[in-house]
Every structure is written in C-alpha cells, then in structure tokens.
C-alpha cells in the first residue's frame, strides 16, 4: 500500500489495544486472510494460525485490514493485518506476542507490509522502491468526486493530460478519449497496467489506454512510478508506469450515486455504481461483480461567455482582429468576394469582419459522454497451495460531438491523393447564378466559398467497446517460493460515424448543372441516371432538403485492436546473507498485438469531405524473458542501517526486422546510513518498439489548430520567413486582393499522420537519484527529493506543425526543401494540409526535480479536535527538448516554460478529520509560462515591448472536499461533496491565433469548466 493510502486509513482509525495469548507457531505456513473488517480478519488469522487472540470488541469495531495472502510466519502475518491501524506487534518478556499502539508509526514502513501488487517489481518481499512512487487511493478518489481517473491523476505534478474531453473536440480519432502522459513524453511512453498486467490499447491512433474505460468505482488505488520500467514490464515504460490496482475484497454490497454541475451552467454529470462480493463454499470461492454508469453532459460554447468572444490574434504583426469571422458564409461568397448573399439577398463587396460567419455558436467545450462499465472477479482455492483466479472488465463508451457545418469551395480537393477539385461553376450554363455574378466572373468560371448549413452541423459519434480479461493460476512452492501463470486477452472495437459531411464528387456533379427545355438537370449523364439533384448554392437557405440529401455523406470508420499475452514467473529467496534474504524472480512473457481498420468506401475513394482514414492491418509479436534480483548487503552496520542493491534484465525478441532483439536492464541502490534517511538511485535502459499504427498506417487525416507563419505578412514585413511567404505567387495574389496583407482564414488545418515501416526501436537511458527523510524527532513528517534525467535516442515521433512550417519558410535558400514538401496550400494560398510522418528523430531529453513532503499531526495540546495532514508535491522541469536534423544543422525544439510544460508545478493539501467528518483543501499551482517559445523568440527579434497574449501569469486552482460518516467505526453510509476551482478561475485568455489557444479562448491545461460541484452518497450493506 502506498503512503497516501496508509495515511487515509490512519485518519479513519482509532486507538485500540489487542493482546495475543497462547503460543505463536514459529514455522511459516500458508495464510489467506481476506481484506475488509479487521475483526473478521483477526478471527480468520486465529483459525489459520492455530492461536488464540484476545481483544476488546469495541477497540477493533469499524477498523479495516488490507488482508494477507502469503506463506509466512504468524508474527509477520499479524503485523501485515494491522497495517494502518496504529498497532504494531511486540513480544513481551514472557515470549508472548502483544499489540501496542505507536503514535508515530512511519508511513512507508506501515505501508510496506501490505500484500499487494508492487508497482515496479515482481519480487515477493521488496517494498521500498529505488524510484519514486506516488499513489492515490480509493478514499481520495471518492471524496474528491472524480468520475474520470485521468482527471484525478493530472492533479499530481509530473502527470499531464494527453487527451481529454476538453481538448479532443476537433480530433478525428482521439475525440472523447482520456489519456495521460508522464513527464510530457506522450501517452504511448506511459505504460498503463491493470493489477500489474498489460492491457489492450483502446485509442485509435496510438498505443495508449483511455482511462475512461476503467471504472473508478472498482479501483482500490493508483500507483504512479516514474523512470524507465522496461526491464520489469517490457516495451513502452519509457517515462514510467501507471498501475491501476482494482478492488480485491469487496464483502457485501456497495452502491454509490454522484451528481455534478458547474457554477456557470452546462456540463452536468451523473454516476450510478453498484458492486457486490462474498465468499462461498467454506471460503474457498470468492466472487465479485459490479457495474457503473456515468454520463457527462455537453458543455457548449454558448454556455460560456468567454468562448463566444470573437477575437483573432495575428502573431506576425502583433495585432488583433475582431470579430473573428469565417469567410465561408451561409449564403455564399462569389468572384473573390465581389458578390455575396446574406439573409436579405445579393450584396456587393464581401467584408469578412462584417459579413462573415460566426463558427463559435455550434462549438463544444466538453464532449458529452455515456460510459457503461462492468467487472467480474473470482478466486478459487484448488488446494491449500494453489489458487485459480480470473477477472474481466467491460467498457462501452460513447461520445457525441457537434461542430459547425462543412464548407466547400471551388478549390476544395478530393480523391485519394487530392487529385481532383470541385472546380468552378460555368458562368454561362449554371441556371441558378444571377446575372451580376455571371458578369463579374472570368472566363474560367465562377469561383465560390459556401458553408453548407442546410446539410446540418457536423456530427461525430464514437462508440468504443473494450473487453479486458485475465485468468490464471498461482501458488506457493517449498522454501517460500511463489509462482504465477496468467493468460490475458483484450479486445477493442471502435466505430466512428461522421454525420452531415459531404460527398464531394456529388457536389461537383450537382454544381455542374444546366437548363434544358426549361428543366434544370445535372450535365453528367451517368450522374443524372444515378439520381443527381442540381445544387443551388446562391443564397441563404437556397439548398433544398432534396439537394442536401443528395450531397450528404454519413460515413463510418471501424477499428479493432486485439492483444493476447501469456506470462509466468516464480519469485522467492535465493539464499540468505547476513543482512537478509536475496530475493529473485524469473519469468517469461509472450505477447501478440494486432490492429485492423475498415473504412467507408466513400472515404477510401477520397470523395467524402470527412477526414481520410485509410484501411490497414498489422501484427506485432514479442517473446520475452526476464529476471529481477534484490540483495540486502548491509543491515544495522555503522553508516549502513540498510544497504540494498537491486537489478533487472529483460530480453525481448520481436517479429519486426527493424527491431529484432532488444535488451532492457536496470540497476538500483537503496542506502540508509541512519534509520531516518534513505538514499535511492537507479539507472535504467528502456526500449519502446514502434506500434502497429506507427509502422503500418498510410496517411490518415486529423485536424489540428495551426497558426500559419505567413498570416499577417505584408509587403514590408522583414525577415526570411516573410520573404519566403511573399515568394509564393498564391500568397502574393491573396495579399494584393486583401489590402496588402495575407490573412489566414481558418486555423483548423488537416494534419494527416503517416506511419513508417522503416521505424526501429527508441532507447531511453534514465537516471533517478533521490532521498527520503523521516526524522525520529518529528513523528509524522516525511520528505523526499528526487532528480530525474531521461534521454531518449532515436525517438519515434513526427515534427510539430510549427516546426515543419518554420523549417520550410526560415530557409534562406528558399522553399525548395524537405519541410516544404509536407505543406499544401490551395489556389488562394490558404494553408490546408501539413503531413506528419513518423520517423526516428535524434533525441528527446527530459530532466527535472520532484519534491514531496507530508506531515501528520494533531493539536490536542491546544484542545483542537481531530487529526491533520499537510502535504506538498512539487515538480521543477529543467529540460524538455527534442533534437532533429534541420536544413543545415541539428535543430532543437525547447518546450520548458510554454503552456503545458511550465517550469514549476505544485500541489498543496491540508486535511482534517475526526470520527465523523473529513475535510480536504487542495491547491494546484502552475507557474508562469509563455504562449510558445517560438513566439517569444519572434517578439524579441521584432523588438515588441508588449507582445499580446505571450507572457502568462501563475495559475492557482483551489478545491475543497467534505465527507460525513455518521459512524466512522462502522462506515456503512458516507455523504461527500466537492467544490473544485472555488474562485472560478478559467486561466489565461488565449484567443484564436495564439499557439496554445483556440477559437474558444482557452487552453485545457487550466480547465474550461470553471467552478464545479459534486455531491455523492455511498452505502454499504
């Protein structure tokens, strides 16, 4: 059990005394004492140990135990059962075992005796790790009202959101996911485990686990271990491991309901959960089952005044345009804007700031989500030394997102390689065009831009179904050795339906119409025979329902991920040293990951306006063997109260020719010169093989918010970038037609990602060095300081859109370079596409310092009731950078100090509890940042004294949670509530055009909800 979980149990515990009478048996034996009520656990221990326990009922009533499953001596088992109760085992002068109260029991020592899956190791009796472990237990998750594990974990410094409901509205494949990233190194470098086991990826575009598919109701605690973990768990554990440890010993029935709302309206939520468990067949069989359903309602842009502020920032000139409207209007804009339609009819001289279309009104800030989860578990004791077990987790997550209606123009391209364009309308044959527009058009035809609102807003429906299951056998051998054999199967099926998109081939046919014998018809005979309906785009509401039905395309995309694993290991003591037993583990793992996708034929042929998602299939297989060892070198020696060395090695063989065989390893040391101080260090080599999408996927569309480096460029703007922008004839023509300045019309750009079959593994060398201090003179206090350095060579990544744009246009030799080959502009110079292909870049490096401290105390001497705990978690980023080969030299992308990668982050907490109440105040701090480091460099180069929206102040968010239990010693009923973001701080104002902002003027790092409330009730019976 982590220190956080232990402290919670301490706060809920009471003083008690227990006397053990009789003779304790000296030899080790097998124990299986269930978690739950302490009295029941002590009775079970008494039966299994063959000893008599004497205790006062009132002293143990309401206390709980974590349970023990082990082959151990009774004294050790009893000590484990009492972990977290402020009781410890002592032998009196007569030789009998006794239980005495220790007011200042060290947190981690109490935590170290729990029989759990130890994150970061498979060794039996190794509880202190050489790398930092931060945990969040069930009580904290419950009382803070979190329904999403990712949202809860991002309160921990160093844990960042990767994808969330607040930042994936425009994403093609990630919409509605909920993933995290350790050290900002990416969700695919954070290995997520469930009870120490790998689990199938349920993200559409990378190897990542969406935490929304794991029901928080069934989670006992979550442990986050930083540092390379590939030697223990295999590929992907580059930045660290998130181990989600599920409920193991639910006795009886537990039910919960939680409701949430926001102070400014919208974004409500509700959760219903129920679970039941019990023992049968003379306690040989344990069964548990449960289900949870939660709904996150939509938070629309219209629910927040800030989201509707229509502002466009132009970074090239450090100016603001307001209102920030789209030139793709609902009535159509024709002949380069010389004519347009509004509600009153045909008008001359379109001005975007006056006549444009406001896209924000249909926007979504929080994607609505329905989440149904189920879980079943069983354990069956086949013999006294062998147990069969199994568990399955099912998740069905649906999300629905709404976006503004699709736009179409004469330069809109379609086809697999964008080889076709919709094209101009005939100025002589089109039967709907008025005389004014026909007369103004050139001989090449009528150019146009039109938002097709009559078809309806874009609707994106995602359904993600995930099944995870494991079955296994485990048992004990002679000489205190244990073994475990597990088979796991996981399957993810995702389907996306994109409604109200356009069939661009049909749009082309329908626009190419004529009047014959007084009847308007499509000119293409084959299209006409297939039911072509001529399309009238001239005017607001000019598209009839029949026209809309003909060009509408509701498309689908389906993906299936499957994972099968077989793993086994044995663990136990190799031999004894004077300081203790040398513990070891030996094991194997065989894994197969398979991905296949199926795409709507209209998407495959490229005629649908929805993002292009290709069909592909790929399989990765890996066979691995591993070993771990921990050796206590010294104990109770001068300047060596404890000295332990540990190490691990894993050899993996892949079916990928570019990867082959990899070797991961780690070596660590823990040294306590005195009992109060523990120094820990570990050096590890970790690998991550490319996943199926990174290897096999053809280019697949995605939509990113991209600020064009050419936006705002004028004839006099200095610098190489501006010079290269003006050299593009399309941009120059657009400048001439727009008053001498080039303006980006939309920052929503297609940014397709492509795999690369030549990728090979990335390799990380990680160092952690730190210390833990628990002074005996200050009971209840603990502090730790850790330094980390992660260096990833041959890092698998694609360059950012900003890096590709800058690499293209900052070349003094012009735009004939590899970066410009990834960039596509339309006939008017507008940025429409940037291709991102995965490649092995030079290096990514992350360095920093983590500080943690907690102090548990009471103020009884001042007659203040209750117990207190103060805590601090602080993270200081020293470096986060990526190197890649530029035009003529190695370029470096620095990220520290920008939005999302602040130099300083911290979380402060103060808890108070008594026999009935628990109150928790927490504060999250994000240090001052800049919108982007590229913008800061530009501002310095331009000499701007006051660059807009660049320098952003510190951010604080304060939360409070309160819970009430009528009888804490028998906590069958609990009422709890939270207020998050008490002071309703939305963070910095970041409009469209800033690198980290968007058209709704926020960044999800700071949240988009504002003040939020939850109220819940939990009962057990």
Regions of interest found by a model, annotated:
Residues 791-793, 878-881, 923-937, 964-1021:
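C-terminal beta-signal and adjacent terminal beta-strands/loops
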Residues 249-253, 265, 281-284, 383-386, ...:
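Short loop/turn motifs that connect adjacent beta-strands in outer-membrane beta-barrel proteins
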Residues 42-44, 48, 94, 100-142, ...:
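Short, acidic, small-residue-rich periplasmic hinge/interaction motif at the N-terminus
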Residues 299, 305-312, 339-369, 375, ...:
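Surface-exposed, low-complexity loop segments enriched in small/polar and acidic residues
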Residues 197-226:
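Short acidic/polar hinge/loop motifs at secondary-structure boundaries
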Residues 97-100, 125, 154-198:
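Extracytoplasmic beta-strand/coil segments of soluble accessory domains associated
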Residues 645, 782-935:
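Gram-negative outer-membrane beta-barrel transporters
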Residues 97-102, 149-152, 178-181, 210-212, ...:
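N-terminal periplasmic accessory domains that precede
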